[in-house]
Curated annotation (Swiss-Prot):
A GO term for molecular function: tyrosine-tRNA ligase activity
Binding site for ATP: K233
Renumbered ranges of motif 'KMSKS' region: 230-234
Protein name: Tyrosine--tRNA ligase
Function: Catalyzes the attachment of tyrosine to tRNA(Tyr) in a two-step reaction: tyrosine is first activated by ATP to form Tyr-AMP and then transferred to the acceptor end of tRNA(Tyr).
Keywords, ordered alphabetically: Aminoacyl-tRNA synthetase, ATP-binding, Ligase, Nucleotide-binding, Protein biosynthesis
GO biological process: tyrosyl-tRNA aminoacylation
UniProt KW Magnesium keyword: no
EC code: 6.1.1.1
Family assignment from sequence similarity: Belongs to the class-I aminoacyl-tRNA synthetase family.
Catalytic reactions on record: tRNA(Tyr) + L-tyrosine + ATP = L-tyrosyl-tRNA(Tyr) + AMP + diphosphate + H(+)
Enzyme class: ligase
Length: 346
């Protein structure tokens, strides 16, 4: 079936590149766009705790962007992966409840359900015997040292003492690329922290003569605490979560690291990667902005207290969508259960 989208190829290419910090490779992305066919992209997540604002909004905005550009999106709910990675102490029932919570957050934020499929890893793997065969073939292709270098995808270090199940994890994630759809995934749309396993999938495809996936890796926002720290669920004060109250949002933003420099500045990152993309137009410190270049130019002269107030107000406007969504009687218990889960340290 041919893509019926009327936007020209150059515009579609620009739109797809706008969501990525890194593209592997541009030539193959151009070929895909020029083909005019409907393509398939995927993103996946471990249901491993509270969902922070970057994971929620970037997933929704990138998914909708891909669909607008003529693609279809698979959101892969990696429940078995979370169990293997010892999230929620391996309690699969809690993990699955968290997965349902994530899906509801995406819905509240306006994900395009017409072009999105949610696939649960446990159900998919159990019903597709070829998945295990593919995973074992990738394991045969790889070395232990190569797989351990991919441990960043699990939030682990290469030097960590890993369980045997965690060694399988990168091979399984690479297998997703070739098994989720019969013809293979066209675009891996994951965070830049997942690039090593994407490269493993690309190298494997090259070696086995398979369709080579395109990797469109998005930026990972830094912690509100400042440079050298990635936004993390393990640092509640370093991130805004989609179940935070208005007061919690305001307090976190007011305490956030923010200098006159835009480099390594979490407030500027929130504006650039979340708020401007979401709203299109921002009123910051009494001035209207429609592009990041103008904000960057004026940033050093902005009153940071006033700026933080504006940023917190915009964030609360977005999270209000989620707050209202979970007021539905059938969802209030789900939210209560999620809030009660405490992620143990591993």
């Amino acid at each position: 079936m041919e893509n019926t989208d009327h936007t020209n190829n150059e515009h579609r290419l620009t739109q797809l590149l706008s969501i990525a910090e890194e593209c592997e490779t541009l030539d193959r992305l151009k070929q895909l766009v020029d083909s005019g066919r409907i393509f398939t992209a995927y993103n996946g997540f471990e249901p491993s705790g509270r969902i922070h604002i970057a994971q929620a909004l970037i997933t929704v905005m990138n998914t909708n962007n891909i669909i607008e550009c003529g693609g279809q999106m698979i959101i892969y709910i990696a429940d078995w992966f979370a169990k293997m990675n010892l999230k929620m102490n391996g309690d699969i029932n809690k993990i699955r409840e968290l997965g349902r919570y994530f899906i509801e957050v995406f819905k509240a934020c306006g994900i395009n359900l017409d072009g999105t499929r949610f696939i649960w890893a446990s159900e998919f793997i159990a019903s597709n015997p070829s998945y295990i065969e593919r995973m074992l073939d990738i394991a045969e292709f790889s070395t232990i040292s190569r797989v351990k270098r991919c441990c960043q995808i699990m939030g682990r270090n290469e030097s960590d003492c890993l369980k045997a199940s965690q060694i399988f994890y990168p091979c399984m994630q690479a297998a997703d690329v070739f098994e989720l759809v019969p013809e293979g995934i066209d675009i891996c749309q994951l965070g830049i922290d997942q690039r090593k396993v994407n490269m493993l999938a690309i190298e494997y495809a090259n070696d086995r003569g398979l369709k080579i996936p395109i990797s469109l890796s998005h930026h990972m926002l830094m912690s509100l605490s400042g440079p050298k720290k990635k936004m993390s669920k393990s640092d509640p004060q370093g991130a805004i979560f989609m179940d935070d109250t208005e007061q919690e949002v305001s307090e976190k933003i007011s305490r956030a690291y923010c200098t006159d420099e835009t480099f390594d500045n979490p407030i500027f990152e929130y504006i650039k990667y979340l708020l401007l993309r979401w709203f299109g137009t921002l009123n910051l410190c009494g001035k209207i902005y429609t592009d990041i270049e103008s904000i960057q130019e004026d940033f050093s002269s902005m009153n940071k207290r006033e700026l933080k107030t504006d940023v917190a107000n915009y964030i609360n406007t977005i999270i209000d969508l989620v707050r209202e969504h979970f007021k539905k009687p059938e969802l209030s218990e789900l939210l209560s259960n999620v809030k009660s889960y405490q992620q143990p340290s591993k």
